[in-house]
């Protein structure tokens, strides 16, 4: 039986959806499952980790781990992997995961694969699938090492309701501080917006929104739907949206239930960040915009006319 260690994705004391998705997949392939949680004051998350399907919970809870630092976090994951005897170590697709995974792979002499969208396990043979060249090709990779460290794309696996694990907590000691880098402060998004990675609905704006008035109008729609609010790279480059809202190859990778692209033409770099969405709705006044080639539903029209109608229809449905 394979042993899968999932690295819990925790942001400001909140367990991210990707953790449950990875644990569900581990259960689905019949693996023995464990999770490692790292941070400060995180023991309250243990029941949620059990409910998500973990059978063993490695917990590194220490004031020294309050601020993310790739070196110490990697040391905690390596220690948990050794104690558990993990064959597979899975990270969610986050900046932290992408920073820690290569360090863990190096220390464990394991293979490391990034942006995984599918994984199969037959006997001792592990095979992963990942996009490459801005999603123009799909790579099928056979792993020839005993261990694999993988960073899994958002939405690649579904969280399954009704599964559960068992509580078996193993406490880990905090490693020595990283002498090469000292984290002084982490600055979080102060907008209060829903995290793009966890949002069931994401609405993004592109150059077609033109100016702040267009952005504000679409933001009101996002508020109506309690949706995450993102943008294309063009809006970031123009200084109209912050980089942490950028969806695309060089920004956030999202896979919500519904993705609404407003005023976005559909550059390949943007599509690479949202083509895992379950349903895509595009709004653009250009009927030839490439975004319509990937959209499930399309509305050709000016956003200043379309968005108010959408908001009004939403109000009618909720009335």
Language model: regions and residue ranges:
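N-terminal glycine-rich FAD/FM-binding segment characteristic of electron-transfer flavoproteins
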Residues: 1-319
């Amino acid at each position: 039986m394979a042993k899968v260690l999932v690295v819990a994705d925790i942001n400001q004391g909140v367990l991210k959806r990707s953790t449950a998705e990875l644990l569900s997949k581990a259960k689905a392939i019949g693996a023995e499952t464990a999770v490692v949680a790292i941070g400060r004051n995180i023991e309250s998350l243990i029941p949620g980790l059990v409910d998500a399907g973990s059978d063993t919970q490695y917990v590194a809870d220490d004031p020294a781990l309050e601020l993310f630092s790739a070196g110490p976090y990697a040391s905690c994951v390596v220690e948990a992997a050794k104690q558990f005897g993990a064959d597979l170590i899975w990270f969610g697709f986050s900046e932290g995961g992408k920073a820690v995974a290569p360090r863990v792979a190096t220390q464990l002499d394991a293979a490391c694969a990034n942006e995984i969208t599918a994984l199969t396990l037959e006997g001792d043979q592990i095979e992963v699938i990942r996009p490459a060249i801005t999603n123009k090709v799909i790579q099928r990779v056979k792993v020839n090492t005993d261990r694999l460290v993988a960073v899994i794309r958002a939405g690649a696996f579904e969280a399954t309701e009704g599964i559960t694990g068992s509580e078996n907590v193993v406490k880990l000691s905090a490693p020595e501080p990283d002498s090469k880098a000292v984290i002084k402060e982490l600055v979080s998004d102060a907008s209060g917006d829903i995290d793009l990675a966890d949002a069931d609905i994401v609405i993004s704006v592109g150059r077609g929104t033109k100016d702040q008035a267009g952005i504000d109008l679409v933001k009101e729609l996002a508020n109506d739907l309690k949706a995450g609010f993102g943008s294309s790279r063009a809006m970031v480059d123009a200084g109209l949206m912050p980089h942490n809202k950028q969806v695309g190859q060089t920004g956030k990778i999202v896979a919500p239930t519904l993705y609404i692209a407003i005023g976005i033409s559909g550059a390949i770099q943007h599509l690479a960040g949202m083509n895992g969405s379950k349903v895509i709705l595009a709004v653009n006044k250009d009927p030839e915009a490439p975004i319509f080639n990937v959209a499930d539903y399309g509305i050709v029209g000016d956003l200043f006319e379309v968005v108010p109608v959408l908001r009004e229809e939403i109000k009618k449905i909720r009335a």
